[in-house]
Amino acid sequence: MSNPQPEKVRVVVGDDHPLFREGVVRALSLSGSVNVVGEADDGAAALELIKAHLPDVALLDYRMPGMDGAQVAAAVRSYELPTRVLLISAHDEPAIVYQALQQGAAGFLLKDSTRTEIVKAVLDCAKGRDVVAPSLVGGLAGEIRQRAAPVAPVLSAREREVLNRIACGQSIPAIAAELYVAPSTVKTHVQRLYEKLGVSDRAAAVAEAMRQRLLD
């Protein structure tokens, strides 16, 4: 009794460059593990094929006419379709890769990947693994760190003057007299400082200002 053949991974391929698309389709088909169920030359057509066939993986060019690959990934996620979208591009900018993954892509490859690497990435993606080209990992990590870093609040010149005087322990009337403004104006500046620093009292404001090096 022969063992049953493993089910092939069903794939839709979308790319507006016919020669590249045909080469990828041929490589996937010759792998013996993939069944290409549809081809598209623009994003909207790729999305319709995905909705019609519900493939395991959609291998899409990042830049296509109409909808780009990341927009298709976002649509697939919004429709709650089971297909995992794997993008491929000649562009390696970390911001593009990060945004594409945020929009719902399960992976990102470069077009200089070998056919063997593309086939492996498709199979890995079908197994639920997130796939990113090795040469993109360092840049992507840097992009994530940069976006995760807290952004220092933007303070006006007057807010900085008030903040520095608060740090010196001056009272609101004293600050008002020194800056030639009404105490109510100083109170408004203090409240805005609390909001920008994410605090609710003087001590916390000074501590946060010191942490973020906002004091002169």
Curated annotation (Swiss-Prot):
Domain Response regulatory span(s) in chain numbering = 10-126
Task: Report the domain of life of the source organism.
Answer: Bacteria
Q: Which effects follow disruption of this gene? A: Mutants show no change in virulence in mouse model of infection.
GO annotation, cellular component aspect:
cytoplasm
Which SMART domains does the UniProt record give?
HTH_LUXR, REC
Q: Where in the cell is it found?
A: Cytoplasm
Q: What InterPro entries does the database record attribute to this sequence?
A: CheY-like_superfamily (IPR011006), Sig_transdc_resp-reg_C-effctor (IPR016032), Sig_transdc_resp-reg_receiver (IPR001789), Tscrpt_reg_LuxR_C (IPR000792), WalR-like (IPR039420)
Task: Mention any Pfam family matching this sequence.
Answer: GerE
For the modification 4-aspartylphosphate, the affected residues are 61
Q: Which residues bind DNA?
A: 172-191
The GO annotation for biological process reads:
phosphorelay signal transduction system; regulation of DNA-templated transcription
Domain named HTH luxR-type: residues: 148-213
For molecular function, the Gene Ontology terms on record are:
DNA binding
Keywords, ordered alphabetically: Cytoplasm, DNA-binding, Phosphoprotein, Transcription, Transcription regulation, Two-component regulatory system
On modification after translation, the UniProt record reads:
Phosphorylated by NarS.
How does it associate, per the subunit comment? Monomer in solution. Interacts with DevR.
> Additional info?
Was identified as a high-confidence drug target.
Q: What does this protein do?
A: Member of the two-component regulatory system NarS/NarL that regulates genes involved in aerobic nitrate metabolism. Upon phosphorylation by NarS, functions as a transcription regulator by direct binding to promoter regions of target genes together with DevR to regulate their expression during aerobic nitrate metabolism.
Q: What is this protein called?
A: Probable transcriptional regulatory protein NarL
| UniProt source species | Mycobacterium tuberculosis (strain ATCC 25618 / H37Rv)
Gene symbol here is narL
